[in-house]
Amino acid sequence: MNKKPLSVCFITYNHEKYVTQALDSILMQKTDFEWDLVVADDYSTDSTRAKILEYKARFPEKIHLIFQEKNVGPAQNFIDLITFPNSKYIAYLEGDDYWTDPYKLQKQYNILEQ
């Protein structure tokens, strides 16, 4: 994976009701820098993974997947997620949350770069 200025780290577990809105809120971000998305799913038993795979098919270069092969729990899933990116900064979002501002990443990045 090429080093990017920022990686969005997105953690999920059985978030089928929310994951689409969350992913849309991430992918609507407008920035003047490159960023990627790392998704760590903790062996969801609902349709969360299928929905994530639909987005991966649409954005294969932007989205990287960590699909646990068994339920490892939130702590290990989080550790696997935040140690995966090779970026200067990380922005974090949970699978049952979403962003409302399309410039959220740009604003965060600008503040961190000051």
Where are these regions (language model features)?
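Nucleotide-sugar donor-binding/catalytic module of glycosyltransferases
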Residues: 1-114
